[in-house]
């Protein structure tokens, strides 16, 4: 009996349709080698488990109880030099095609149809609270791809693609902020990434909850047509006793995600080509300091996060 599987690697999805339940994990890896060029011994398939443990190569696919078209994430690097291993984003990548949102904010932010969409998300979207909100803490909402993690380059482990100083950044932020992860993918991938990066299991900080693409809304802009955005109003509506415009900041490498709440968004520099930039990227070090400075404030609405570096430099010079 054929067992179709979808494997995600290097920002692309690969369909595997020629294997059956009698084939083994090694057979799957051998087939993936023909698709990706990654040797079986360099492949790590996330989510393939037997009795809670990673499946060995000789385990039959039928024993994994996979549903047809199950999606699996693969980590692994080809045998080329690091420069060759890097997978540059395509020309239409969101980072490259991001646009200046300021002209369209007023038209979109308060439009009734968009506010109604947020109200529906507040009522219908189910949030799994991992750790309860803490009284008196501010809120930090973080994107994943290109913000915390280079999701297009290829590596043997997610840790190699992790933005430098991530755990130090989150440890410091947790002192003053509840931390929420919001990615424009589905929850399965978010959970897999957070586990691979060691974020969901770190003893020095806790994630309050995570949101996926289903919590986003689509808005119409005069110049760009329909786009998906991350409205913080969904969080404020569900947790109004803890969070509001006054105490929330969101980091994302795509500015248009802030379209419904521009005052609360900080556009972070994207972390790309991890193998080349891992030793040079200090963005989270500086943002750790910025978060610590503004945590002293009662109202974030007096800030313009577009000039966060100028604000930090001024405060540190005093």
From Swiss-Prot:
GO terms for molecular function: metal ion binding; proteasome regulatory particle binding; protein serine/threonine phosphatase activity. It comes from the Eukaryota. Its EC number is 3.1.3.16. It catalyses: O-phospho-L-seryl-[protein] + H2O = L-seryl-[protein] + phosphate; O-phospho-L-threonyl-[protein] + H2O = L-threonyl-[protein] + phosphate. Its main location: nucleus. The keyword Hydrolase applies. It holds the Pfam family NIF. The modification N6-acetyllysine is found at residue 117. Residues 133-294 form the FCP1 homology domain. Gene3D superfamilies: HAD superfamily/HAD-like (3.40.50.1000), Phosphatidylinositol 3-kinase Catalytic Subunit, Chain A, domain 1 (3.10.20.90). Keywords: Acetylation, Hydrolase, Magnesium, Metal-binding, Nucleus, Protein phosphatase. One of its GO terms (cellular component) is nucleolus. Residues 3-81 form the Ubiquitin-like domain. Its cofactor is Mg(2+). The Ubiquitin-like domain mediates interaction with proteasomes. This is Ubiquitin-like domain-containing CTD phosphatase 1. The gene is Ublcp1.
């Amino acid at each position: 009996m054929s067992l179709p599987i979808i494997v995600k690697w290097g920002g692309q999805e690969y369909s595997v349709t020629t294997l059956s339940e009698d084939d083994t994990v090694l057979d799957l890896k051998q087939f993936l080698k023909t698709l990706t060029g990654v040797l079986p011994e360099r492949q790590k398939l996330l989510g393939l488990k037997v009795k809670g443990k990673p499946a060995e190569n000789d385990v039959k696919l039928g024993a994994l109880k996979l549903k047809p078209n199950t999606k699996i994430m693969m980590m692994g690097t080809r045998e080329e030099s690091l420069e060759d291993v890097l997978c540059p984003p395509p020309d239409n990548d969101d980072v490259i095609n991001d646009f200046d949102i300021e002209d369209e904010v007023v038209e979109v932010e308060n439009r009734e149809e968009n506010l109604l969409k947020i109200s529906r998300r507040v009522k219908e979207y189910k949030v799994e609270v991992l750790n309860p909100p803490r009284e008196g803490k501010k809120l930090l909402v973080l994107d994943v791809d290109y913000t915390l993690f280079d999701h297009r380059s290829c590596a043997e482990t997610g840790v190699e693609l992790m933005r430098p100083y991530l755990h130090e950044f989150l440890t410091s932020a947790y002192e003053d902020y509840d931390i929420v992860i919001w990615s424009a993918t589905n929850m399965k991938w978010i959970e897999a990434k957070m586990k691979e990066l060691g974020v969901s299991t770190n003893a020095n900080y806790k994630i309050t909850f995570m949101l996926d693409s289903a919590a986003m809304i689509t808005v119409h802009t005069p110049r760009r047509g329909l786009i998906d955005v991350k409205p913080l109003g969904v969080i404020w509506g569900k947790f109004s006793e803890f969070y509001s415009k006054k105490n929330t900041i969101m980091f994302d490498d795509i500015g248009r995600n802030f379209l419904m709440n521009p005052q609360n968004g900080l556009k972070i520099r994207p972390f790309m080509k991890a193998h080349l930039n891992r030793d040079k990227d200090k963005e989270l070090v500086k943002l750790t300091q910025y978060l610590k400075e503004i945590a002293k404030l009662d109202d974030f609405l007096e800030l313009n996060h577009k000039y966060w570096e100028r604000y930090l430099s001024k405060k540190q010079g005093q």
